[in-house]
Amino acid sequence: MEKKLKSWQGWLLFCGAMAVVFVLGLVVSSLMERRAETVSVFNNKRVEITGIEARNEVFGENYPRQYETWKETAKTDFKSEFNGNEAVDVLEQRPEMVVLWAGYAFSKDYSTPRGHMHAIEDITHSLRTGAPMDDKSGPQPSTCWTCKSPDVPRMMEAIGVDSFYNNKWGAFGSEIVNPIGCADCHEPTNMKLHISRPALREAFARQGKDIDKATPQEMRSLVCAQCHVEYYFKGDGKYLTFPWDKGFSVEDMEAYYDEADFADYTHALSKARILKAQHPDYEISQMGIHAQRGVSCADCHMPYKSEGGMKFSDHHIQSPLAMIDRTCQVCHRESEETLRNNVYDRQRKANEIRGRLEQELAKAHIEAKFAWDKGATDVQMAEALKLIRQAQWRWDFGVASHGGAFHAPQEIQRILGHGLDKALQARLAISKVLAQHGYTADVPMPDISTKEKAQEYIGLDMEKERKAKDKFLKTIVPEWLEKARANGRLAKL
């Protein structure tokens, strides 16, 4: 005989089913509302944008939520144990770096990076870009603008890529005026992610890859890889090029540069032909566990947020440590304190090796100069200079990637460890050269305990540099901005 449900059990089952249907209805309704709001955003644009629109404020008319969070990249109120979003004078913290960059503009000025909204201001105020008083003077090429503004692809389209690169930095001061923003990463009509800089596309092509076949998730990293990479200025035309032809590793790129017989500069003390790493964030991140598991840059640096029923990417691009609840804890269940300390532990270990490497490498440069002064020959110094080049390339590659100690901690420690080994080998090679010239005592070391003392030691006239920059900022930059406003390059909303 079949067992019948009691009356109250039937009613309980009925009510439970109704509750499930009700909840599902709410979920579907919420999803439909979100979709409707998303469609509404695209169908009710206040401004029709076509072509390359460099003025971020114009995009803000159509996408106010994204725009308002992007403006927060102007903030300088976050600080972690090793990084943050305010400009900190790294040369003041680590005066050995002045010696490592002797003969190169970075020995004058190097600070931690601020947010994207400061891109134009920071490069304009940097002592590295000099004080050009006209379109034809100054120490830097216009290639230095490449990653600073959506005005760059606009200018490339207008005058050609080669012509853009093959100019002085000061030549486009009145054109490159809007900081890193919307058009750098998005198509204007549908906001689809796109590649706006030629170097990344060209690097893929040389590897036999079609970047247009990248998945949407891959694009959430590749738009960052347009700039957060290692690159160099190739040839007299200063053509921006990624040295990826042999691979992503520090050894692969070194082999590429060696084959091309390339050096960024000749060191003022040691005479070593130095490679200056830029910021190989993308390459190093690809060697880490997160990228290998399919996590993109935007997943951690631009997490989703909800507002008014609308889900969108937070365009306040910053360290995930500033918002652990929306980044790390989306996947990891540990406490904020535990996760933060996990990051710091990796960074502390890498920085321990970094500090030792900087000290040994600075001594190697100083000792090499001492050997030259004692009459060393090119043949005698060849091995030491090769080792110095290799050591400094590994140091800079590891240090220039600001998040490398977290993105790929094992790889960063390997790179810095190899750099330290080569720096010590260089010092040993120099000691043998000195012995050949009858010198066996310790090489006297200058006082480079502060940035100012180190800059004086390598022969910089910093007062002259600052005075020239001050004049440039007070006379030339206002002219650039006035011309930009007159030509409609800055928004008037």
Curated annotation (Swiss-Prot):
UniProt binding sites for Ca(2+): 230-231, 276, 278
One Pfam family here: Cytochrom_C552
Enzyme class: oxidoreductase
SUPFAM superfamilies cross-referenced by the UniProt entry: Multiheme cytochromes
Similarity annotation: Belongs to the cytochrome c-552 family.
Tagged with keyword Oxidoreductase: yes
Binding site for heme: 144, 147-148
One CC-aspect GO term: outer membrane-bounded periplasmic space
Residues bound to heme c 4: 297, 300-301, 407
Residues noted as binding heme c 2 in the record, renumbered to the chain: 182, 185-186, 315
E.C. designation(s): 1.7.2.2
Binding of heme c 3, residues: 116, 224, 227-228
Protein's name according to its UniProt entry: Cytochrome c-552
Main location: periplasm
Domain of life: Bacteria
GO molecular function terms listed in the Swiss-Prot or TrEMBL record: calcium ion binding; heme binding; iron ion binding; nitrite reductase (cytochrome, ammonia-forming) activity
Residues noted as binding substrate in the record, renumbered to the chain: 231, 279
Keywords: Calcium, Electron transport, Heme, Iron, Metal-binding, Oxidoreductase, Periplasm, Signal, Transport
Origin organism lineage: Bacteria, Pseudomonadati, Bacteroidota, Bacteroidia, Bacteroidales
Reaction catalysis annotation: 6 Fe(III)-[cytochrome c] + NH4(+) + 2 H2O = 6 Fe(II)-[cytochrome c] + nitrite + 8 H(+)
Signal peptide coordinates: 1-25
InterPro entries: Cyt_c552 (IPR003321), Cyt_c_NO2Rdtase_formate-dep (IPR017570), Multihaem_cyt_sf (IPR036280)
Binding positions (heme c 5): 290, 328, 331-332
Subcellular location: Periplasm
CDD domains: NrfA-like (cd00548)
Cofactors named for this entry: Ca(2+); heme c
